[in-house]
């Protein structure tokens, strides 16, 4: 592919918007959950999650292990790779309108759930790469040729080996290519052949990945449990309903926040736009019923792939980072608005810019809240270390037990009420027996020798040696106990 002047302008605009959107992360990125361990030990460990290509990439760019913390370079590289991938499909979807293309494609990053993905100092690279490759894979397969199916299958194996949740992005961009062909009066037969080709590329790649990679590399009880498919028996329907309700509870955090009108407006705009697209197609086309049915199916599919195949997992991970599909859905809504109201570009751009502005304000609040919480955690660990030293029982005790969860930083107490999603985005590391509590302690030079005690302890009278308004501290047997108030 050759880049023309429009591609270069598009990349410049998109990167400019992306830098503004992620500016707090580019200037000061906190250590986000897994980052704690990787920055401390320098290990890889993605292969056990079924993500061997992530291991390979970081092994290569670090010339082996231990890997180093090069933040914010991984995030910057991830955004650049995403921009290059999007430039490959810009012309097909938007023609020469690189300004609207930039605004619409930014919805992938403006996805409020994607904030968690971008917050990782290491994974931000491979997660952005996974999204980028999934888009290219979908595009390559949507050109009916046997060789394209093979290439798409290889790319599918690649993006699944980086981050499996990007599968939903593949599917939603397939829907984008279909609606593009509907608008451009492509024949039903060509649309059907291209769609079948894209689906074939995904299926072949997925099963190859599942058999040759996931089946052989996924290890550890946590990873194995979360990769199991619901068994086909009497509880199948019940399991699917349970997953749908659980994901809806996660999704509803944005509908219950102060920015809810943004997401309702996008859905409303999608419905109106698809109606307009259908009416235009009916006026000019012979296959009226077929086009109508196709658009209805596209609408339902676009909503399904916010969650996608994860509803069929026995124990899916309910976390913002897996809802990458929401960014694809937001993009798809904007694309349909663009197609339905091509003669009103200025109004569409203003609407897209407004969504992006509100999303940027929300993301800045999230990044600052995550940073404030991490600073509080470091302060708590420092204070615990001082208490242990002052009380004099640290030299002969090697185990530490946490009971309860650290409080929110004072500046976060209001934001989690204003925006319920913040409760999911702001990690509270010191949380009972969570393994990252131990890693956080080991990052502090004064408490690095303590190991987390994950068995139950019985608190009896006299166990408490000291306390403050955040926690009580004392000893039970050979274990230091910290109980949060």
Curated annotation (Swiss-Prot):
The chain crosses the membrane at residues 9-29, 66-86, 98-118, 131-151, 159-179, 194-214, 259-279, 293-313, 322-342, 350-370. It comes from the Viruses. Pfam families: Glucos_trans_II. It is a multi-pass membrane protein. Keywords: Host membrane, Membrane, Transmembrane, Transmembrane helix. It is found in: Host membrane. GO terms for cellular component: host cell membrane; membrane. InterPro entries: Glucos_trans_II. Its main location: host cell. This is Uncharacterized 55.3 kDa protein in gtrB 5'region. It comes from Salmonella phage P22 (Bacteriophage P22).
């Amino acid at each position: 592919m050759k880049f023309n002047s429009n591609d270069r302008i598009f990349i410049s605009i998109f990167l400019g918007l992306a830098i503004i959107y992620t500016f707090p992360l580019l200037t000061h990125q906190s250590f986000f959950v897994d980052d704690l361990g990787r920055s401390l030990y320098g290990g890889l460990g993605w292969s056990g999650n079924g993500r061997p290509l992530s291991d390979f990439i970081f092994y290569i760019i670090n010339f082996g292990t231990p890997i180093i913390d090069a933040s914010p370079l991984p995030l910057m590289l991830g955004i650049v790779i995403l921009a290059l991938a999007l430039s490959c499909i810009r012309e097909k979807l938007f023609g020469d309108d690189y300004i609207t293309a930039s605004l619409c494609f930014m919805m992938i990053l403006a996805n409020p759930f994607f904030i968690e993905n971008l917050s990782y100092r290491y994974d931000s690279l491979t997660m952005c790469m996974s999204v980028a490759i999934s888009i290219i894979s979908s595009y390559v397969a949507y050109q009916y040729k046997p060789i394209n199916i093979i290439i798409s299958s290889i790319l599918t194996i690649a993006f699944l080996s980086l981050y499996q949740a990007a599968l939903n992005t593949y599917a939603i961009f397939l829907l984008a290519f279909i609606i593009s062909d509907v608008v451009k009066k492509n024949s039903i037969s060509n649309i059907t052949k291209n769609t079948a080709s894209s689906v074939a590329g995904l299926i072949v790649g997925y099963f190859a990945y599942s058999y040759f990679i996931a089946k052989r590399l996924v290890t550890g009880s946590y990873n194995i449990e979360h990769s199991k498919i619901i068994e086909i028996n009497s509880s199948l329907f019940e399991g699917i309903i349970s997953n749908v309700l659980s994901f809806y509870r996660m999704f509803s955090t944005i509908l219950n926040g102060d920015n809810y009108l943004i997401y309702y407006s996008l859905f409303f705009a999608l419905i109106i736009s698809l109606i307009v697209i259908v009416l235009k197609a009916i006026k000019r086309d012979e296959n009226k019923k077929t086009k109508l049915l196709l658009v209805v199916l596209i609408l339902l599919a676009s909503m399904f792939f916010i969650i996608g195949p994860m509803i069929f997992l026995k124990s899916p991970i309910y976390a913002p980072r897996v809802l990458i599909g929401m960014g694809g859905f937001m993009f798809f809504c904007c694309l349909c608005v663009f197609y339905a109201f091509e003669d009103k570009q200025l109004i569409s751009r203003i609407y897209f810019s407004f969504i992006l502005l509100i999303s940027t304000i929300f993301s800045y609040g999230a990044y600052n809240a995550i940073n404030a919480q991490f600073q509080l955690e470091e302060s708590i660990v420092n204070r615990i270390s001082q208490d242990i030293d002052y009380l004099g029982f640290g030299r002969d005790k090697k185990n530490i037990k946490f009971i309860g969860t650290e409080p929110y930083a004072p500046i976060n107490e209001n934001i989690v009420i204003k925006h319920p999603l913040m409760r999911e985005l702001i990690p509270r590391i010191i949380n009972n027996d969570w393994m990252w509590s131990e890693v956080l302690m080991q990052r502090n030079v004064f408490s690095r020798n303590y190991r987390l005690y994950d068995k139950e302890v019985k608190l009896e009278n006299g166990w408490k040696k000291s306390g403050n308004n955040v926690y009580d501290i004392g000893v039970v047997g050979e274990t230091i106990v910290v109980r949060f108030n």
